[in-house]
From Swiss-Prot:
<dbReference type="GO" id="GO:0005524">
    <property type="term" value="F:ATP binding"/>
</dbReference>
<feature type="binding site">
    <location>
        <begin position="37"/>
        <end position="44"/>
    </location>
    <ligand>
        <name>ATP</name>
    </ligand>
</feature>
<keyword id="KW-0813">Transport</keyword>
<keyword id="KW-0406">Ion transport</keyword>
<keyword id="KW-1003">Cell membrane</keyword>
<keyword id="KW-0067">ATP-binding</keyword>
<comment type="function">
    <text>Part of the ABC transporter complex ZnuABC involved in zinc import. Responsible for energy coupling to the transport system.</text>
</comment>
<dbReference type="GO" id="GO:0010043">
    <property type="term" value="P:response to zinc ion"/>
</dbReference>
<keyword id="KW-0864">Zinc transport</keyword>
<feature type="domain" description="ABC transporter">
    <location>
        <begin position="5"/>
        <end position="220"/>
    </location>
</feature>
<comment type="similarity">
    <text>Belongs to the ABC transporter superfamily. Zinc importer (TC 3.A.1.15.5) family.</text>
</comment>
<protein>
    <recommendedName>
        <fullName>Zinc import ATP-binding protein ZnuC</fullName>
        <ecNumber>7.2.2.20</ecNumber>
    </recommendedName>
</protein>
<dbReference type="GO" id="GO:0016887">
    <property type="term" value="F:ATP hydrolysis activity"/>
</dbReference>
<dbReference type="GO" id="GO:0015633">
    <property type="term" value="F:ABC-type zinc transporter activity"/>
</dbReference>
<keyword id="KW-0997">Cell inner membrane</keyword>
<keyword id="KW-0472">Membrane</keyword>
<dbReference type="GO" id="GO:0005886">
    <property type="term" value="C:plasma membrane"/>
</dbReference>
Amino acid sequence: MTSLVSLENVSVSFGQRRVLSDVSLELSPGKILTLLGPNGAGKSTLVRVVLGLVAPDEGVIKRNGQLRIGYVPQKLYLDTTLPLTVNRFLRLRPCTQKTDILPALKRVQAGHLIDAPMQKLSGGETQRVLLARALLNRPQLLVLDEPTQGVDVNGQVALYDLIDQLRRELDCAVLMVSHDLHLVMAKTDEVLCLNHHICCSGAPEVVSMHPEFISMFGPRGAEQLGIYRHHHNHRHDLQGRIVLRRGNGHS
C-alpha cells in the first residue's frame, strides 16, 4: 500500500526547545491513525508538520503528489455579533460551489442545519459542519484535531460512526488527534502516544463484548469506543527528561 504521507525521524525545535524528536509515522489510504498525548506533548506541532505548515529541522517527509487534505480544527472562533448561517460560513471557503454545500452537509447528516446560525450550534453540530467543510475539498487525507472536544459520549459515538463511514466511502487516510489518553475510536488501525517523541504505539483493545463496557456505553457505544492500553518503558520528569521504568512499564 502506497503511503499518502510518511515521516521518518522528524525533529522540530523552536529556539532551544526540542518539541518533536525522531518521530516517524505513515498515513495510508483507508487507514485511521489516532494520536494521543498530554497537553504540550507536541501533537499540534506534529499536525502542522503533516499539513506542511511547519518544516522539520531534521528527518524526511514524503507526500503523494497533489495531495488533497481536509482539515477540521480543534476550535472555531467566531464573532458572536456577526450574523452568519451555516450556508454562508461554508461559502467562505475558497473555490466552493453553491451546489456542493447541501450535499456535503447531508453526507454528515447535517443538511437540516444549512440555514441555522453558526453561533447557535451545539458542539456536535459544529463538528459536523466543520467536517462538511473539510469534505468540500474531496480529501485523500482527513486531519481531525480533537474532533470530540466538547461533545458528550453519545455525540462521540455518532461522530466515530460517521468518520468510519467516510473513511470507507472515500478510501481516505484519517489522522485524528485525541485529548483522551485511553478512550479512543475502536476502529482505529494504529494509536501513537506522543510526548515529544513516540512513547508507544499499538491498536485499541477490543472491549465491545465486555458486559461492563456495554452496560456503561450501550451496544452501539461499545462497538465504536475502544481502550488503548499504554506500554511505556519510561516516564517523563517535570523537566521533560526521560526516566526509564523498572519492570514491564505498562500504564
